[in-house]
Amino acid sequence: MLGPMRHSEFWERMDHHLGRAYARVWADSQVIDELDHRTPSEALEAGLSPKLVWRAVHARLELPPVDY
């Protein structure tokens, strides 16, 4: 993916991989070390870029490289 990622694209990817109902629950509950021990939701709220947060989520979920 080139360029910055919008928050809406981040959530579209989350919905695609985890389902719309579960994506928010997962993002609110999974603490990821690479996000300074924050959940994805906390990291986004703290101002981390959606692209950086997606990379950490991608690694945690062990998604195939094509979904990067």
Feature roles, as predicted:
Residues M1-Y68:
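C-terminal alpha-helical interaction appendages
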